Amino acid sequence: MRCLHCGKEISSHADLTEQKNRWHRRCIKKFFGTKELPMADITEEQLEQLANDTVNQGLTVPGVQRKMSIHLSTDLNTKLTIVDYPAGYILKPQTKEYENLPEYEDLAMRMAEIAGIQTVPHALMRMNDQYVYITRRIDRDIHGKQITMYAMEDFCQLAGRLTADKYRGSYELCARIIKKYSVLPGFDLSELFLRVVFSFLTGNSDMHLKNFSLKEQEAGKRNFCLSKAYDILPVNVIIPEDNEQLALTLNGKKRNIRKKDFIIFAEKCGIPVKSAEKIMRKVCLLKERFIIACDESYLPEMNKEEMKQLIICREEILH
């Protein structure tokens, strides 16, 4: 049995609470800042209403997942609720349209961490006998009643685009945004390159302009750097009929991507070819670890195999 937060084994000698929750006590403290795993004070009716709102707005993957901002209340019992402020967490439940989205996102985030990509704090929880995905917001620090806010702007905003145009752009545009606004452009450009390579390898065709952001490093200082990665999904596996391999254009295209396209992109970013090849080689060498992560994930066996086959095929293109 593995912890739903850190992914490490829960000892057979662990207390019954850890085994029941499938969370280490230390992981509960790290993620929620509490001694006990919060109970989810969210009803089936609220989840159903969220589903209806999502469908009515036409918000499905690719696009916007069902999600709700939630508050951690410690007044009487430790619980997660949607009625109070401040909302320090985001919860993503299961959907009828696409099965196992929480499990897919959890796997994708864990593989990103294996690749050396910094990710937002995230985990799985059990709710109504199903997995839900939960992430902690990084644009605020909440300590009791004290809240510190950090400015965070996504690339759609920084490019002056409407949300509806989040797929109309290129990764070269993302590089220009970083060069213009980041206080660490060299580091962030290399990180951008790594994330685009990783997105291709794992079938994430949904890394659009709103899924990249710059965030203040110190509240109120306006010292922006590329934020930690979030909203990572292997859409090419979830929706096999999606023919596009990337959300934005790379070297002028979204499909039939080849290794040379990444090299040309690196040159446009000002990344030396040798450095770009080293990054791609590093990601390819992690193939076996990605496959192990798939095997250890909470996806059904068929979905695990589909995920592994995609990684193997994409690695051959990058190799």
Model-found features: residue ranges?
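A residue-level signal for conserved active-site and pocket-lining positions in enzyme catalytic cores
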Residues: 70, 112, 155, 206, ...
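Conserved ATP-binding subdomain of kinase catalytic cores across diverse folds
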Residues: 46-166, 274
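A glycine-rich phosphate-binding loop feature that marks nucleotide/adenosyl-phosphate handling sites
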Residues: 127-130, 211-217, 283
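Catalytic-core segments of enzymes that bind and process phosphorylated/nucleotide-bearing substrates
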Residues: 154-177, 214-274
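Conserved kinase catalytic-core segment
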Residues: 97-113, 170-237
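Mobile late-domain/C-terminal helix-loop "cap" segments
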Residues: 251-312, 318
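ATP-dependent phospho-/nucleotidyl transfer catalytic cores
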Residues: 128-201, 248, 264, 268
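Regulatory N- and C-terminal appendages and interdomain linkers associated
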Residues: 1-48, 52-54, 220, 224, ...
